[in-house]
Amino acid sequence: MPTDDIEKKVLVTGGAGDIGSRLVKALLKRGLKVKILDCQYGPFKEEKHPNLEFVGTGDSELHGGMANRDIVQKAVADVDVVYHLAINWDGHTWKHQLPLADLFDVNIRGTLNLLEAAKSQGVRHFLFASSCAVYGSQESKTVDEETVCKPELWEGDPGPAYGILKLTAEKLCLLYHHECGLPITVFRIEAVFTDSDALPSRKIIDNLRKDGIIEVTRGDGYASIHVDEVIHAFLLATLNKKAYGQIFNLSNPATFITYYELYKFLIQNTSSKSKVRLTVDQTSSGRAIESTKKIQRALGWKPFKTKDDLKKAIIQSLKSI
């Protein structure tokens, strides 16, 4: 396991979030000393683990630790590996309910602060959690890491600004790799689900509650990925020279579900009186399936969850609605 080569500490930005907190737990289980750069404690509020250290906790939601150069320098000190999962984002932002200028300032400046600190302090590996949202709307039904990204054309959740933000951060990471020699790995991650959290978008839930006719385009749907599959990829890539300077898709095509199948499944498992109708004359949503052949060849990573696992998680999620 590459993590056995870590001599110092590791830093997880966004370590109190859904994915970050699980990565932190996996790293602690391996006996590593972990720093968390986050504005909140999340599931670690009562945690007293001797190998766990918090930096930047308590900063405001908008101006969290990433944007503060001094806090970032402190966070990166004595660190071998940086896992950059933090992002300041709000689901409503793409409808311009929050100022995009502020969010781009915090996130891009924060990523630059981390990269600069990583370069100056001799970090051995910088891993960035990007998103498959960078692909935007595509004519092809399958995309790989060489596909031209068109995030500005995306019209669905989480909106074009999110993909543009992630793609910009990707380019900055790769710049520091090629110009400064900082080992970088970028993961483009699909929608992540857990055993108890796989809620569809609010739009889908709202449609169900209207108890009307729901029209969906034949064949349209989406793939996702279980959080354990994501954590496995991060651990496999850590300090692995085959991952340096690379972009990898993280998705599980086996979980692909059409919107028709999803709505039928949700109606069967809720009190919704909605009806689903297939249409063939509408334009496809443009959502493609991400190929994971590259990471499977390079690192030996393989997805291991199924569509049944996704459906079980959706049922668990429905209990919280």
Regions found by a protein language model. Name each.
Residues 2, 9, 307-321:
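Amphipathic terminal alpha-helices
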Residues 10-30:
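N-terminal Rossmann NAD(P)H-binding glycine-rich loop of SDR-like oxidoreductase domains
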Residues 56-106:
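NAD(P)H-binding glycine-rich loop region in Rossmannoid oxidoreductase-like domains
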Residues 82, 96-127:
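NAD(P)-cofactor binding segment of oxidoreductase domains
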Residues 112-161:
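Conserved Rossmann-fold NAD(P)-dependent oxidoreductase catalytic core, especially the SDR/UDP-sugar
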Residues 139, 167, 179-182, 193-203, ...:
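Glycine/proline-rich active-site loop of Rossmann-fold NAD(P)-dependent oxidoreductases
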Residues 140, 174-222, 227:
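NAD(P)-dependent short-chain dehydrogenase/reductase
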